[in-house]
Amino acid sequence: SDLWVQKMKTYFNRIDFDKDGAITRKDFESMATRFAKESEMKPEHAKVLMDSLTGVWDKFLANVAGGKGIDQATFISSMKEKVKDPNAKAVVEGPLPLFFRAVDTNEDNMISRDEYGIFFNMLGLNPDMAPASFDAIDTNNDGLLSQEEFVTAGSDFFINDQDSPNKVFWGPLV
């Protein structure tokens, strides 16, 4: 769907950390490093996050890249095929609990509105955009995101090609 393509363009934009128009393993490494540093993540958690994010590259994208970066059009066509894989949901969900841990800076097993603003800041987005996304994925409207809500929203972003509140998980669509 056009919406799914727009979501993939949004994600591509968020993970192209060096903004060179291509995603590489280095972008995933940079994302993990920034999240670990800005959330003051414990070293053992930082290693798991790094392994998980580079694992997304290794499992999903390295064969597409062929030793170089992946441009947006190639990324989108590859993801169209990848999400059809029966293991896609598990691979997509893999790093999400680690992102959750990175964003849950006070380690209370919930993400507050303020902590979600930190998530947006880590992605290079204006934290002022976070409340609208937060409210959209706070499915039980308790003002907090559980790990289940966070992982479900993040996974749905990639897997679901229909309109849903989770389309704003990675921020406003580009």
Curated annotation (Swiss-Prot):
This protein's UniProt keywords: Acetylation, Calcium, Metal-binding, Muscle protein, Repeat
Pfam families in alphabetical order: EF-hand_5
The protein's name: Sarcoplasmic calcium-binding protein
InterPro entries, per the entry: EF-hand-dom_pair, EF_Hand_1_Ca_BS, EF_hand_dom
GO molecular function (one): calcium ion binding
Its job: Like parvalbumins, SCPs seem to be more abundant in fast contracting muscles, but no functional relationship can be established from this distribution.
Record PTM N-acetylserine, positions in chain: S1
